[in-house]
């Protein structure tokens, strides 16, 4: 696999068996939005491709469970820190499951690594990289000769992204430990960690050595990732990561989507209208480094492309596909899966990979038209679809449930009742009643398919 490093601006080859990946996760004070979803889905694809390659992947995604935003939520709601963070961690993980994001090997929470954070600050203090102000302990960026080497930023152009609530030695200096009588004891005084320190301590505790890949949204490159790299370089005496990957912004109407800009589109909002697999397909449909402009029409088109995958599955009578063995050794045998894997190994070239998937589906349908009774052909296509599902992370659902998605239990019972009435009417040659029932269901966007095994129904989503 070759990946474009955000720092070197060139593709770097991953030529080792064991791969370590750390993805910056959410600050858990609210439901996750599509920006969080895209980051998780993009780097879940990376993980799946590596696993399909036969790599052993050690994957961590953290939770920031102590932060100014969480404290503000505490003040507004009257809830404890634990009540808020537990609720939103559970909410986030529910969203990830619906999006078919594989569970990380490690899900560190910042509050579980306070001792490690204090140890890191002590190392930095010992070597003269810190100073004290009235509100906390700060990192002196002027003492780090390589500061800004990660983001290659001109500091003057990025002052607006920095915190300037106190008079620091340098505008780029950042807090390591915030004094706060409500939190943790330390030799520096009671307080809580700064955000940039949290990730470094968790990475050092879990991986111990330089990461192969550090991933996150492009908005984290500066100052968050720059400040992480500085602390690791100065405190741990090593490079934090060999490869840095950053996914592009999710935008709405051309504007970056974020909670701070009050234009978030929550994952749960999208999931009210579209199934998780359709949303996953959509979020994957442009290259991870590209900025992603959300549009309802594009999401609907992504759903139509995914429908074709499921139509082929249905034609083959291929039911639910298990995602269980993705985390274990999986062997890619089909030629199409090997070709798509080769494409994705070039910096996750998803557009080319999905185009090839579309071509494969069209070709498979043509072959089945010509050789509808060829059992070997059918089995080969089934195996290919199963392998492709595990690589892309979509296509696992039972086809009947897929095409009936979005129908409530009560609606389902009513539909089944009407189908039985229609069947009875047809038996009695009461075709006017049978046609009226079909029309009634059609008006509710339900289409009926009469088969030798009975009538089945689908929800029309377009």
Curated annotation (Swiss-Prot):
Entry-linked Pfam families: DALR_2, tRNA-synt_1e
Record's subunit section: Monomer.
The enzyme's E.C. designation: 6.1.1.16
Motif ('HIGH' region): 26-36
Residues that, per the record, bind Zn(2+): 24, 199, 224, 228
Coiled coil feature spans: none
EC top class named in words: ligase
Species of the source: Campylobacter jejuni subsp. jejuni serotype O:6 (strain 81116 / NCTC 11828)
GO biological process, any: cysteinyl-tRNA aminoacylation
UniProt keyword annotations, A-Z: Aminoacyl-tRNA synthetase, ATP-binding, Cytoplasm, Ligase, Metal-binding, Nucleotide-binding, Protein biosynthesis, Zinc
UniProt motif 'KMSKS' region: location: 256-260
Subcellular location: Cytoplasm
Cofactor(s) annotated in UniProt: Zn(2+)
GO molecular function, one term: cysteine-tRNA ligase activity
Disulfides per UniProt: none
Catalyzed reactions per annotation: tRNA(Cys) + L-cysteine + ATP = L-cysteinyl-tRNA(Cys) + AMP + diphosphate
Binding locations of ATP: 259
Protein name (record): Cysteine--tRNA ligase
